[in-house]
Amino acid sequence: MGKNLIDLYTDYLISSFSQTTATGLSTLVDGCLSHDQITTFLAESDLDSKSLWLHVKPMVRELEKAKGTGVLIFDDSIAVKPYSDENEIVCYHWDHSKKHYIKGINFLNCLFEKDGISLPVSAEIIEKDECFIDPKTGKEKRRSSITKNQLMQKMLTVTQNNRVLYDYVLADSWFSSADNMKFIKKDLHKEFVFTLKSNRLAALSFEDKLEGKFVPIDSLPLNEDSLISVYIKGLDFPVSLVKQFFTNKDDSEGVLYLACSDSSSDYSQITAIYQKRWSVEEFHKSLKQNASLEKSPTHVKKTQQNHFFASIYAFVKLECLKIKNSMNHFAIKTRLYINALKASMKELHTMSEALA
């Protein structure tokens, strides 16, 4: 029942265009499953990062056979839950893109991308499991006993132990700490491409590093389409630094500083590899808009966790449908919506004819 029910539940998450509830699913299957059976499934299942890996492992092994560069992409996001009661996983988190705190479920994911296919191989919910008194306000607040950088390293270790075949780790500046760089290069013997903030300090030579002659990277003589080798403060190995220009939505010009640990890669290769990171933005968007991540009204931590991972399972199902039907997730969702409208119109016409 459990395996069949997770398959049915993920179908429901993909098919739904409103709140996803136990009552709604029970009604959809004409009562073949009761409300209590569905709530019991959500309350007693143990969906987590380990079960996610077992679910996607056969697909990952097939994808590893494809030609091209395989990458692991790390990023976090927040599933907004403004009306849910606060607990260890539903709490206030700083949203660095919106520059303010948001109430919801913060999660960190590891996405394996190769040949245009994206598969989540690890995901963790950020738990603020410690309460403390803010000395400035005197109010009780929550914090996590483990940092996101520590969690990232833990997830990388698990992924390495699972023998996922990848070439680079990609992440934005929020995860580009020197500790993460050293861990990937020295402990895992892998390469990385990270963005850096413009005020990150670097030395132009090993001698400058030893003498403490570090300068902000935005002051370095770096042109587009070129790279220089630098020593980021805190590292004992050089990285290739490139400066990439891009156009924002408001037509203003932006700059990305990319640091790559692979000294054999040139500007074009580094920027092409980092371009793969944007698939994680599509992952987050599809989770929220196509897999009903934010549409469950559950109030209990356990059911919230299980719904979260079920939404990721639903994303994987959409990715498989994308491959089979040559349609992106939003095109698939649109087709479902149009067919639902057609069925609704047909039913309405039948009802109208009965009145004639």
Set out the residue ranges of the language-model regions:
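Generic hydrophobic, aliphatic-rich segments that mediate packing or membrane embedding
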Residues: T21, H55-V56, G68-L72, N106, ...
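Hydrophobic, Leu/Ile/Phe/Ala-enriched alpha-helical segments that form helix-helix packing faces
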Residues: V29, V60-E64, L156-R163
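Active-site-proximal, Lys/Arg-enriched surface segment
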Residues: Y12, A43-S122
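Short N-terminal helix-initiation segments at or just after the protein's N-terminus
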Residues: L8-T20, K50-K57, N106-F112, S198-A203, ...
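Gly/serine-rich nucleotide phosphate-binding loop at the start of the catalytic core
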Residues: M1-S51
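Glycine/proline-rich, flexible active-site/cofactor-binding loop segments
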Residues: T20, S26, L33, L111-I117, ...
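Single, function-defining residue in the core of a domain
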Residues: G2, D11, S16, D85, ...
